[in-house]
Amino acid sequence: MSSPRVVSLGGGHGLAAMLQALRVVTPHLTAIVTVADNGGSSGRLREEFHSLPPGDLRMALAALCGDDDWGRSWAEIMQYRFTSSGELNGHALGNLLLTALWDRDGDPVQGLDRVGALLKVVGRVLPMALQPLDIEATFRNWEGVHVIRGQKEVAAGKGRLEDLRLIPEDARPTPEGLSAIAEADWITLGPGSWFSSVLPHLLVAEQREALYNVKGKILIALNLDAVATKSGDELA
């Protein structure tokens, strides 16, 4: 019996945990990662280079690194974060490497594939879209209605979510991601911050249509526990 083809949608630590589990089951893995991060090292590089935020993509690559000394060593190097009193403070080395490749070649998918080959990753890592996105949400609480913009801000939003949208709204997925979804035996959504890492995948029109028409099965992985600062985690 051949190994199943699995596409995993999400972002951040939740997606990384899912990938670490799935890689034991199948080598035919495609991770499709949110590209709306606006905080920390990713946010700084995104603003300076007008590039995709690399952090969640870096974490997915590290989670799928080759299971040998070479792969594990490079995964640790990719996750290495500088501590200094200068401009490098807080930057992860993997973020800088991905941004350098994108800046040089202008091709996010090629850059991810190059780093994937370096790390001997199991499967493939793709961005949810080829341009950096912003997440905007409308929450209602006892103080009234509030519009919040930004991935880290939406993740910590309080109250009942009334609307969630991407900016720009016409974001286009990668052809490679759409093909992987169409051919998948299984698609996973979650775990993670639902409002900022998982549900945005359903706001990309072409990707949502591909998921609606998929022949494989869809698995939704809820969070084991809620995080007090993450409103979207209350779904668990």
List each language-model region with its residue ranges.
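Glycine/threonine-rich flexible loop motifs
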Residues: 194-204, 229-230
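Short, glycine-/small-residue-rich phosphate/pyrophosphate-handling segment
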Residues: 40-43, 229-236
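Gly/lys/ser-thr-rich phosphate-binding loops in alpha/beta enzymes
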Residues: 1-55
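Active-site glycine-rich loop that binds ribose-phosphate moieties when present
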Residues: 163-178, 203
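Charged helix-capping and loop-helix junction motifs
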Residues: 201-208, 234-236
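An anion/phosphate-binding loop that grips the pyrophosphate of nucleotide cofactors and donors
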Residues: 184
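Electropositive, gly/pro-rich neighborhoods at or near active sites that engage anionic ligands
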Residues: 34-159, 165
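A short helix->loop->beta-strand "cap" motif at the edges of active sites that frequently abuts
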Residues: 26-27, 213-218
